[in-house]
């Protein structure tokens, strides 16, 4: 009876689908790939803080130009607020001529007004993430910006730590950060402006505060004022109109 049951089980077992791989091989592969990326991008041409739409778009464009680009993101996922258009609703909009970026990435959209275009946020952000990866951009997610590396009056890199460290009590998380260096840092962290605020704390940049919402005026500022706010540090996104240099 026992032999018959065993034969029945064997007969019902389907053909093998997946290749053989030991658990330790998987662990080594993950650890090695992470180490290789960190070793290669610890010194990059450009480091971008924030993997929202601004950071992802900039990283793709710069990588296609031949620069070695690293993006850090404090969340486990990439895309920032691009997943949602507002008030927890996921359609997102752009005004002409910004839809040309959607054309370039193959993102479908529809016209909903005079010069106003709409697409599902998940579709747009997934295409943009894929395009950045295809261009050669590397990412460190769950990585939190802590401070700037400064040399001779110029931003030369950033100081980072694991994001979960900041969520634990300090008395049990004596975990030192590490430094990453680059020729240029781009702060694409959104309204937090984490890198710029480190300069404000040291009175190297003046901060006039955030203006009330005005889409047309704010988006024009993004285009016209994106640039260096301090040697080695470029600021992007809507907060570009907020800081000024005192020198």
Predicted regions and their residues:
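N-terminal Rossmann-like FAD-binding beta1-loop-alpha1 element of flavoenzymes
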Residues: 44-70
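Short hydrophobic core segments
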Residues: 49, 179-190
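Flavin (primarily FAD) binding-site architecture
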Residues: 187-202
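Single conserved hydrophobic/aromatic residue that forms the stacking wall/gate
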Residues: 239-242, 246-247
């Amino acid at each position: 009876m026992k032999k018959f049951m065993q034969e029945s089980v064997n007969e019902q077992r389907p053909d093998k689908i997946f290749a053989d791989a030991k658990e330790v091989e998987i662990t080594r592969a993950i650890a090695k790939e992470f180490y290789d990326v960190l070793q290669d991008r610890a010194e990059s041409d450009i480091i971008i803080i924030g993997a929202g739409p601004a950071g992802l778009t900039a990283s793709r464009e710069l990588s296609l130009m031949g620069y070695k680009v690293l993006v850090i993101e404090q969340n486990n996922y990439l895309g920032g607020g691009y997943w949602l258009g507002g008030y927890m609703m996921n359609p997102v909009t752009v005004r002409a001529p910004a839809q040309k970026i959607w054309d370039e990435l193959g993102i479908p959209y529809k016209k909903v007004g005079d010069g106003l275009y709409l697409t599902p946020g998940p579709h747009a952000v997934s295409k943009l993430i894929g395009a950045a990866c295809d261009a050669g951009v590397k990412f460190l997610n769950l990585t939190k910006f802590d401070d700037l590396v400064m040399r001779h009056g110029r931003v030369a890199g950033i100081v980072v730590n694991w994001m979960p460290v900041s969520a634990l009590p300090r008395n049990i998380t004596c975990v030192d950060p590490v430094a990453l260096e680059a020729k240029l840092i781009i702060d694409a962290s959104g309204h937090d402006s984490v890198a710029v605020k480190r300069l404000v704390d040291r009175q190297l940049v003046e901060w006039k505060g955030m203006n009330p919402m005005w889409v047309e005026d704010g988006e024009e500022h993004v285009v016209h004022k994106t640039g260096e706010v301090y040697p080695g540090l470029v600021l992007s996104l809507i907060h570009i109109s907020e800081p000024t240099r005192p020198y």
